[in-house]
Amino acid sequence: MRVLFWMFIGFDRHATSEHLLSAIIERLCEAGHSVHIIQKDTGGDLPIIPEKLSRYDVTTDVIPYQAADKGNFIARYLAELKYINNCKKFIASNYDAVFIQSNNLAGFAVKAIRNKLPKAIVTFNVQDIFPYNVVFSGTIRKNSVMFCVLAGIQRYGYKHSDHVITISEDMKDTLVADETEVDKVEVIYNWSYQDEPYENVDLAPVAHVFKKDYFNVVYAGNIGVMQNVDIIIEAAKLMKDDNDVWFHIIGNGVYREKLELRASEYGIKNISFWPMQPPELAPVIYSAADVNVIPLIKDVYKTALPSKTATCLACQKPIIFAIGMDSKFGQKCMKEAGCSVVESDHPDELVEAIHKILNGEKDEKAGKFFRKYCGITENSGKSAEIITS
């Protein structure tokens, strides 16, 4: 089959989803399909076709893209709409199947495909569910005129896709409740960078970050409103007299400066803020931690799941999900991977979970869970099969 792979990032710059997308392309090529990529030119200096894909039958069109200010919701939406319009002339009429990367303009993207390729198999990937995610962040109100319009555009995209791939049972429930046909929604967990859990990781590259004589509590990733890193600051406040515990916030984002200021106002001494690290260091950071914390604001588990989750599981260190006890994914990780789950807005519960792990209460089954549910070859292969079926 000829597969059109429509991305809403560019390979010219590192992104959290690049290893997911490149793995799917690799599986498609290994299965004998040819792949043409439409992607953004974001001005980065990385190869537009990653080295590991260069040996396959992969071609690409690169579309100039001017990013909007991350804090300007409307400008960002319009920038994405402009990107879709600029891509239309590159959508040829000879593709058998189309994969569309997760984006906030599903209806516009799918309609552009259907206009050119009415008989193609269309698969839409949902990594987060817009506009419900921005409702939870407080950007817009549910059932407002804006929400209804934006939600209607997304529903159109899901309705006119043949397959919808999402990344958790919680998110599937949200899609189905929002009128997506249950039979077209497939759950495939995101994966890490390899099939096997990480063993004997060389921690030297982050030796300057972590303190050997402390219990290191780690958050690494984007620092925005949705990530709810606030709960870690509040937990650190409650534990600022714990002389054997050190908190590490690793990453950048629009909310970081506010959190640094709050930590200073609280007089928290046992906390460090570090800049975002290269993606290849993610397994090293998570392996060096004594516990990794994965937080989200209240109810966001219904619309998103942090992409780092699989890599954290692969590193086989204790994990605390501060996402809410009602999460199906959280409950599954608690039962099958031995992870802890606490509410998003209860820092006292996070403190209690940290103390339990500090005191040796661990149930280390994360590696087994990772092998069972998060293998890169199997899960990217499942995605490739759906795209071409």
Whereabouts are the PLM-identified features?
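A charged, aromatic-enriched C-terminal amphipathic alpha-helix characteristic of glycosyltransferases
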Residues: L203-A204, D345-E352, L358-I387
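Nucleotide-sugar-dependent
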Residues: Q227, P278-I285, N292-L313, I319-Q331
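Membrane-proximal helix-turn-helix segments that form the acceptor-binding/catalytic region
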Residues: N85-K88, F108, A112-K116, S144-T166
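An aromatic- and histidine-rich active-site surface loop
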Residues: E80-I84, A97-K119, T123-N133, V342
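Carbohydrate-associated surface elements
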Residues: D41, D170, I188-W191
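Nucleotide-activated donor-binding/catalytic signature segment of Leloir-type glycosyltransferases, i.e.
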Residues: H248-I250, E257-L281
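N-terminal subdomain of nucleotide-sugar transferases
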Residues: M1-Y56, D241
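Acceptor-binding helix/loop patch of EC 2.4 sugar-transfer enzymes
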Residues: F8, D12, Y65-F73, A120-G152, ...
